[in-house]
Amino acid sequence: RVLSLELNKDRDVERIHESGINTLDIEPVEGRYMLSGESDGVIVLYDLENLTRKPSYTCKALFSVGKSHPDVHKFSVETVQWYPRDTGMFTSSSFDKTLKIWDTNTLQPADIFYFEGTVYSHHMSPVATQHCLIAVGTKSPKVQLCDLKSGSSSHILQGHRQEVLAVSWSPRHEYVLATGSADGRVKLWDVRRASGCLSTLDQHNGEKSKASSEAANTAHNGRVNGLCYTSDGLHLLTIGTDDRMRLWNSSTGENTLVNYGKVCNESWKGLKFAISCGCNPEFAFVPYGSTIAVYTIFTGELITVLRGHYSTVNCCVFQPHFQELYSGSKDCNILAWIPAPREPVLDDISEKSLPQQHLNPAYEDAWSSSDDEG
């Protein structure tokens, strides 16, 4: 189904935003509600479910934290995330140096964490049962952990040398955190340990640094501004401004050396790419200029390019229940990429026509022509 993703003229997302969209998140409980955050501080919540039961429908905005809201972010919202266990709470972080914990029902902040520098990224563990820590990457090289239970943000992970652009908890081990920095390094941490850092990933797998310490290891020859675990937590995918994407074995820290070719990445801040869940094989959806490049994760093959936005794509999010993709762009639009409906299989297909039914969909266009989109 992922191989047949396309813009669908019967599906639209209500246009609310007046500036570029930086971040999207779909709640994992029902897969129904989506948050978006934009570059002027506004947050919008959408209902993705088709309540009209008609083939053609628009995903409606249920509410927004707009410019007139007393607690709206003053500057660009860089990350939004639902509380993993239910839809009663969500989080947002911003260039206004805050992380806000929102009560969905009242649309009021239940808590606000303040930082000394710009906040690039934050993440809550999708599997944690023993802690309520939010990892936060800021302009400081220190990774900060905010505790929802105590309200404290005193726990700090030290080791990076420049700003931390991306953070992600492992979906396999609740105390393991991955961070990516402008220093070219990706670090894995066990937040229970006093020393913290488990390893610093080495793109050369030790070949060039056997005589030197682990401190010399780099994951990319540029800023690391995106990272994401596979859904099983066994691998970590990272992206850097060296125009490279790398796949790592998350338990050994080994670079798997999968070659994705040149992955253009000029973003000076975090890049929000997505990984599929429940597909075989699994795919990575990577913002690539005004398009989205779709790669098979374990072979590195570029399967297709999704075209539809008019400006730079900043983020995308995968909806696993229906294997749909949503993307946000500087053009102020959120686009829905829907698997093309399968052709009905007729009972009286002749044997001669069977080979045509088995064309590899990877070689078909995965977007609509402009006529179809009209």
Residue ranges and their predicted role:
Residues 223-250:
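Long, well-ordered mid-to-C-terminal structural blocks that present hydrophobic/aromatic surfaces
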